[in-house]
Amino acid sequence: MAAMTTETTMTRIQLGAMGEALAVDHLTRMGLRVLHRNWRCRYGELDIIACDDATSTVVFVEVKTRTGDGYGGLPQAVTPRKVRRLRRLAGLWLAGQDRRWAAIRIDVIGVRVGRRRTPEITHLQGIG
């Protein structure tokens, strides 16, 4: 039984890492520069912190990787509680920075890996 749990956990970890890598590629193609990946503090983790140097905007990105819609779509995956947590984490990260930003944005990127294994990326900007 333990081997099954470990195998499932590793699969989820690998799936999450793949989703984050695809999200980074997507953000880079949009012209954003990634500042941090998996920034952690005692209150949680921010998947990706990126910036748009042209507009001096910092973007905090939550990545949701799914193999199907069994848990609902992307909007259902980001609850008001999750948005509050992301805001708190963003504030903590900003408090430790010397740079001042003209704008701050929280985005969610959904990566859906279907049976064909061709990932579909959905990017919701400014969710909170």
UniProtKB/Swiss-Prot annotation:
Gene Ontology MF annotations: nucleic acid binding
InterPro entries in the record: Restrct_endonuc-II-like (IPR011335), tRNA_endonuc-like_dom_sf (IPR011856), UPF0102_YraN-like (IPR003509)
SUPFAM superfamilies hit by this protein: Restriction endonuclease-like
HAMAP family documented for this protein: UPF0102
Family named by the database record: Belongs to the UPF0102 family.
Xref: NCBIfam families: PRK12497.1-3, PRK12497.3-1, PRK12497.3-3, YraN family protein
This protein's name: UPF0102 protein MAV_3752
Organism: Mycobacterium avium (strain 104)
